[in-house]
Amino acid sequence: MRVMLKATLDTEKANEAIRSGKMPELMKDALDHLRPEAAYFGPLGGRRTALLVFDMADSSDLPATGEPFFTQFNAEVEVFPVMNGEDLRKGLAQLGRTSGVS
């Protein structure tokens, strides 16, 4: 299932990682682990945030998914299902067939 992970980094932990020069390596490790199809980084709500879209093969993968962000950055992590345009078209077509909506 395609999911989006939103990791809102703790400012002090992120500052420490930047000052120590470890931020690039820590982010690379997290990205290598998740292998996202898309990754975006920027300020949301005044805090450094990562938005990653990737395939979660099984719900049992959830604990390990956010762990690098929890342990390295004391981040607030949210994971939720998302769709691309093709997924949405397919879902709406199924909805139309099953709900009787014309």
Predicted features along the sequence, with ranges:
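Conserved, structured core segments of small domains
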Residues: 1-102
